[in-house]
Amino acid sequence: MENGGYIVAIDLGSNTVVAVVGTKTEDGKIRILDKEISTVQGAGMVRGEIKNIDLVSQSIKNAVNAIEERMGIRITEAYTGISGQHIRSVKQPYYVFASRGDEIRQEDVRQLHDSMRNVPAPDGEKILQIIPQNYIIDDKEETANPVGTFGNKLASTFNIILGDTVAINRLEMALKRVNIAPLGLYLNAIASGEAVLTPDEKEEGVAVIDIGGGTTDVVVYQDNIIRHVGIVPMGGNVINKDIRSYGILEKHVESLKTRYGEAMRDAAQPDKYITTPGLSAKASKEISAQNLAAIIEARMLDIIDFAIEEIKKSGYHDKLGAGVVLTGGGAQLKHVDLLFKSYTGLDARVAGAESNLDESSLESAGSPALTTAIGLLMKAYEDRAQNKTINRSRPLSPRPATKEQLSNTGVKRNLNDFYQRRQNINEGTEGGEGGEGGEGGNNKTKKTTIKDNKQEKPSAIKRFLNRLRDYLEEDEIEDNEI
């Protein structure tokens, strides 16, 4: 909502809806005027996708109503973000010839971009964003700024982010059901990246891993360009499921995890025990701090494995000069950055949007759990300054491509695909980026770049794969019962 100089952004997560109202200060910082976090009840959102529109709409309404009452305003418009395992990233090349002589002009760059926007998207999908990579002049010279260079042919490979039409429509329906018009739709992963990164990190090479409840979003930057976006259909909820296996009531699991949990078993106190209420006073449950940490560590390592796989698919995993930035609700667990660093050998830090917040908002809005919502505000202000609008049905290819032609570089659609991919890797039959037509070159070299510094895994990979498959099957059963 744009009224009185402020904007409203709504982040729809698997577990919570985060609504924020913010404005931009004269020095370019975001000032948060109000915020509200509302829990998504039941299975309203599953791995980032709306499954029950009534439950999600009610959560939106709860968050928005609370802000309206405190601020004395009426919210009728908002910017929002999207995630989910339906999101996929593909690469598409295109070129144009110089319009005048042998010099590349701004109009040639504009024509190149417009050409990518004026063709139909594959059936059942919409384009969320089109991101040009480096430009190539006459098939030889590569440059980030082609205007003013000499040449006859301007080419680029575009990183195209696609989303499922049904999932996008459901998100917009959930907003409209509570009388909120969607002003713009952004990819959560990119919004989070904009919120937590510095310009130097984007230039040197960095990966942002946003650990949510149902999904983990991964975005890779290099030379200040978004090189890859991937969605892992696994988040902090897998930790909750294992904690429940100790007999802990579901309503106590999240608070137990966030208040007492640690991401490294060795850091937990060996003689500490936590007691939680049971169904009756006599049925209280007890769990040791080390067992709780062991559960968290095991599941976090699973998430890290798949996040690293997405980073490797970018072809830039050995060029991350600034390491990895962890954010999202799952990044608030103690020692998660140390676990990541010790396991992968990559530098890692946990961050919220502090570097982009006004000083008055640091204490109230600096949490990693608010990163995406603040990033949505930043993207909205950026596009408004450029007089841009979000086109949610941008086209894809100059020669309309089929889904089959595009799917080889897409994000895996569900955990069964991840299971099979991991199994192939362990059997030595799966290649890396280069093995499936990627741009990465030697697969074995790529695999060892990150894993050379890994510590030995704490558990057998086959047991993990079986648990992962069981997790997917249980989720499918629960979805069918709702």
Language model features with spans:
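Nucleotide/phosphate-binding catalytic cleft detector across ATP-hydrolyzing
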Residues: 1-16, 20-206, 249-250, 255, ...
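A short acidic Gly-Thr/Ser loop motif
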Residues: 10-16, 82-83, 200, 208-215, ...
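Glycine-rich phosphate-binding/hydrolytic loop that grips phosphoryl groups
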Residues: 352-403
